[in-house]
Amino acid sequence: MSLNNIHAEWLSLVDISGPFLAIPVLTHTFPQGLEVLSSFKRRRLRQAYDEWREALELEDPQLEELHSAWIDEVLSRVLEFDDDGKGDVLKREEWCRSHLKSVLPDQGVVEYPDLAVVDEQQDNKPLLLIHTYKPNVELESTVKYEGWITTPADRMVQLCRSLGCRLGLLTNGECWMLVDAPVGAVTSFSSWYARLWSQEPITLQAFVHLLGIRRFFVDESEQLPALFDASLKYQDEVTDALGEQVCRAVEVLIQSLDKADQDRNRELLHDVNETELYEAALAVMMRLVFLLSAEEQGLLLLGDECYESNYAISTLRMQLRQEPSELLERRWDAWTRLLSTFRAVYGGVEHEELRLPALGSSLFDPDHFPFLEGRTKGSNWKIDTAVPLPINNRTVLLLLESIQLFQGRTLSYRALDVEQIGYVYEGLLERTVKRAAEVTLELNATKKAQSPWVTLAELDSVSMDGTEQLIELLHERSGSSISKIRNDLSKLIDDSLIERLLITCQGDTKLRDRIKPYVHLLRTDPWGYPLVYPAGSFIVTSGSNRRETGTHYTPKSLTEAIVAETLTPLTYIGPTEGIPREKWQLKSSSELLTLKICDPAMGSGAFLVQTCRWLADRLVESWTLAEESGKKISVDGYILGTSSTQEYLPHDTDARIVIARRLIAERCLYGVDLNPLAVELAKLSIWLVTLAKDRPFGFLEHNLRCGDSLLGIERIDQLTQFSMNPTAQGQKHLFSDEIECAVDEAVVLRQQLRKMTIRDIHDVESMGELNSLAEVRLKITRCIADAYIGEVLMAQGNGTDLEKALAHLSIQVRDVIQGNTEQLELIKQRALTALSFELSVGKASRRPFHWPLEFPEVFSLDGGFDCIVGNPPFLGGQKITGAMGDCYREYLVNTIACGKRGSADLVAYFFIKANALLCSSGFFGLIAVNTISEGNTREIGLDSILRCGSVIYRANPNLVWPGKANVVTSSVFVSKSNWNAPFYISGQQVPVISSALTQRENWQPVKLK
């Protein structure tokens, strides 16, 4: 077996979460492979394990002693930390209590390891911290330590970081979890299981090879921290490769849908546009990811024979693998099974053989993409007959393997972070679907190729100009070298490839013969068929390049730090007043549940996911404090009166965490993104961290919205006065009362929605009805706002033109308010035209986001958000016009920057907008490129924020982005109210922080006379 296969094998048997050791690093560091244990040591270990398991199963009265002996056997003998019993390297609990005690500042508890591996040559420097637990303690389940609610795994992370020791090992006897907790980076968790050590000896070999005593005393470059660091450079490559794998699967699914459409004379998808088709394919992949995660976490019916055999996604891949390959292409029952499972999850199952509560959600709604079931638009899944598409089992197997396998390893969705899933799937947001106007060939291109497609007509035409011109065209489109193209053009074509090409051409021999000279240049599908798209076919192409527009996925290490830093002064009494940490007071659960936190450029929801986790932990702590004072907490998270008959909060800590996360997600989180697919991905991310058994999906439609965060009104009086800079003395229009009344009614409806508790699908449906009523009430107002912003865009700062346009719009609005539906249609058309100003033909119109209309309860009642976090797009000031148009840049300058000109990066306008969207006591924490503190970007962004009275209380300037994006960033934390606590730059206390993110006052340039 090759070294790569050896490492791939044991890695597939270990549960891994977060970045781990890369195979290239393992093969380079261990060229001889893994060390083989002596037969004596293996027998002794097996005997000790069997004795421990027997004592555990029989509840032996000496279990505690046997448990300690078993753990000591592994640490002292197998890993050889204390083989001679002298205790030079492995220090016991009493020593650790004296020498490795640490007060965790954020939790206010004293911690120390149970054991520690130390280097006695370096003043007993700790190399590995160890925690041991009783056999019944799950290492990833939440438990309570002295009022601190955490998991054993997270407890070890905090201890490692507080003591400056990267590595930790924790065990309950069965599971042995290694923790790598580098400061400022993502934590890695990897778990070995003792029961596998005899069944799969290679896992024991890897465990001993990586954690044996010799690994801690070899050259520093071969120690575990160095190996983890060396593996990081492969992490992006692995994630990108997995993302590409999923992208290919989406392509195959769309090609299958296209073929089904061709077989039905293009009637199936005749009313489905390209965007819908791509969204449907992506929805299928997102459904599969959710179901795999839910099944692995035991939240569906995995284990039930009926479910496993007929519905489960986790078992389907292996069932299909057992079918002969020739049958996979000729059977279609797997696609029907997927559709049945999607329906079961959405609508529930009530049968004597199978019971599954309805989970609902727009993601699984069968009527959202009815063509997936062979139904027409407008049909009803409960009434109309479905005719499942002839998508063969081979295609379904490919879909499943793309998300379940990577480099031969089975991916564990229980171990994968939601952020990792988001990172993979966010790459899909850059793709779209287009129809081929004529026969189009897809070239086997390099990764750098921007447009690897060429029409057959183009090839025929350029061929007439000679071979050199043909080669030049193919080189330009594919990115391949000239020599490779020459070789491919002259290469012989075997009969099997000609036959596959004929099948691709649907038996058209003339078409085959025209394409044949180029066949070696074409990319093939996963089964070796050249990719040829007939006229009218759907092609997956690159759409908006999110990275070119400055959009980058935020690594977990950054989201964790920014969320904690921004939310801490919001959730505790003390940080803003400068009170010592030990005297801070956590706010009550009712106060925490009224907080409103927003990410105005949420992407796949990384910041919202971390906010949900962090704030839920604080909420559980708040409940615990309330109960310790004798109070009772309802299952809805509120403190109960003495005579209340409401259901109490469960005692189980894990159940509390889930309840807390669901409450935070439904009541506290808000998000916006310009890309509708990103909004759906953000919903998926939050659903994945709020999964609860027998509970439906949380209702998120009202709080996660689609639109342009910078384009639109942020105050309702901007609309009632038709002015982007309204004043208290400003003149309201005659229609202002109707607008304000509509907003007030929407607020009442959304407040009712927020108070609802989700028990089953009927509660979700009721919330959906309330949300729809609020949407209907604001429909006309939103249309007026769109038209108004459209006129502001088109005027490009010309006050006279804008005044004339708004005078005419005011007359139309008055007629609409009086019930003139024709005028309403005219206003809609007017808005569409204005919002498409300067956009190229075929490009979707701009989508304004009107904050007081989308989130009316936030701005009508509270005056803004309590907190804003996020990673706005990194787009240079010189690129804004090219990417978004002259009128858009003029809009930014005139409405957001209040007329201040300069080549400011786009992020400066996000900073100004964030500050404006906060309530008077709010905070924001945002990431920006380091130019946020330089030149025009600083003057237009941070300078204007500070002039408004806000304060920068913490900054981390000039940080290299921990990923592929070649940027240097700064994270900036701002308080809109007074800040009476210390200020910090890169962790160092300073007297003040200027807009240059230094402690020196800014020197402003003055023009010489």
Language-model segments: residues:
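Signature of N6-adenine DNA methyltransferases within the class I
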Residues: 1-9, 107-110, 132-141, 146, ...
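Core residues of folded domains in eukaryotic genome-function proteins
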Residues: 111, 126, 167, 412, ...
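Short beta-strand motif preference
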Residues: 115, 176-178, 540
